[in-house]
Amino acid sequence: MDNTIIIPYSDVEPKKEWLWKYRLPHKNVAFLYGSSEDAVEALIAQIIASVSMGRALAVDNMNRQAGRVIYQDFKDGQIDAVKASLERQKADCSNIAYVNFNCKKAMECIQELEKGIEEFQPSLVVLRNISQCMEKQKDLYDPLKMAPILHRLMLYATRYNCSILLAESKPRICYEDTYFALTVKSVMQVQKSQQGCFVLAQTRDALKQKCEVVKFKLDAQKTLCWV
């Protein structure tokens, strides 16, 4: 019988899994924000398209199988625009769905979201503009209002073996807030560079896996191209 109690760290195998290496952790919650609606929308569409088709993402080169995605934009009247954005990135829309909510309030929507996740079994869940269904948009920045939502999303990510990405424009969230820091493992920001490109940088990394910035451009049709 092996009674060894000393284990060298060289024998330790990392257990963390990634949907997008060092940016979108598996079974966890990430946050994406930026001042450009077009850039954030195109980046989300590119991520979703890559997952739906089983393609590698920039500076990733991970071999992945095609997976399902729930893409929920809480702004009214966005379904046609979302589909057009996904088609521009050559996504497989048969692997992408949204939940037809019977409610309007944020927490009720999040509770109902679980049924959609359980039924569709997505690899990725993207929730965009969730502030639109909160009582006040500024409630997104209130830790007491966001804590139960974030806690429930973290449960979904672990229970249903998926990554969850929250996306907003121009947030004022304090990333060091206890509830936010305990739940959201990766925070990414889209910024415009002087060269006319957009830069995706990680502004917070709770998993201690720093990753290099990536750049992309938008063409006249708002289609994303990696630089």
Predicted feature descriptions by range:
Residues 1-91, 180:
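The Walker A/P-loop phosphate-binding site
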Residues 1-26, 93, 107, 111, ...:
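Core recognition of P-loop NTPase motor domains used across DNA-transaction enzymes
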Residues 18, 80, 111, 151, ...:
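Residue-level marker for well-ordered alpha-helical positions
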Residues 31, 37, 41-42, 72, ...:
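Phosphate-binding/switch region of NTP-binding enzymes
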Residues 49, 114-117, 151-154:
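A structural alpha-helix within SAM-dependent methyltransferase catalytic domains
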Residues 58-59, 93, 97, 164, ...:
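Secondary-structure transition/capping residues
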Residues 62-148, 218-220:
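Conserved inter-motif catalytic segment of the P-loop NTP-binding fold
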